[in-house]
Amino acid sequence: MKGLGLPTEGEAISTKAKNDKYHRILEAAVTVFAQSGFHESTISQIARAAGVADGTIYLYFKNKDDILVHFFNYKTRQVFACFREEVDQAQTAVDKLRNLIRRHLDEFQKDRFMAVLYQAETHRINRLAEKQIHEMHKMYLDLIAEIVEQGQVEGAIRRDLYVGLVKRYIIGGVDEVINTWLHSDGKYDLTSMADPLVDLFIRGIGTQQELNG
């Protein structure tokens, strides 16, 4: 089998162990960054949280900045894939929007450390993961635009509104709801805010037909 270029059992186990350690370090870093703040965090803190030696960190990442970039490359794309899947399960634009917002709030509620880090870094002026944040933001806006355009075709969303304005109105509302929840130390159920929030959106952008329906 080795002649075919397939990994041996030992190589497969070694690769899995490396991947497991990579993800363990990444998850530990997210927790440390969220609790201590990115600039105040140290490699030693991350290593301790991950249960590895300080030097092990450098086998996977160049430095603390590199860990942050990997977080946005891996974790946020993983979450976005969940958003896409949730949207695709619905038929109408309003249901797609409801599924998207509900899943967004649910994912952030399930992983509060991720939510803290994501919100902090996306609002920072000098962002270390600028490229990754920009790409993630664009993917999310494009997904909302897709839903809005479908809603306009269906007659559920007003056609006199600019799609660019509507999608920023939606993402701004979601962002504010998450920030308010974080500032309250997560004292209430974030996911339960999804339906009321979407109802507010529809009252603002929905057609009379949709509101009467």
Name each model feature, range by range:
Residues 115-118, 159-161, 190, 212-213:
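Short, hydrophobic secondary-structure boundary micro-motifs
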Residues 1-9, 99, 103-106, 142, ...:
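C-terminal peripheral helix-coil segments that are non-catalytic and often amphipathic
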Residues 68-75:
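Alpha-helical DNA-contacting segments of helix-turn-helix folds
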Residues 51-61:
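Short hydrophobic/aromatic patch on the recognition helix
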Residues 109-128, 180-183:
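Amphipathic alpha-helical segments used for helix-helix packing
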Residues 1-36, 41-49, 66:
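Basic, helix-initiating cap at the start of DNA-binding domains
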Residues 70, 85-110, 167-170:
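Hydrophobic alpha-helical connector segments
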Residues 77-84, 128-154, 164-168, 172, ...:
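Amphipathic alpha-helical packing segments from all-alpha helical-bundle domains
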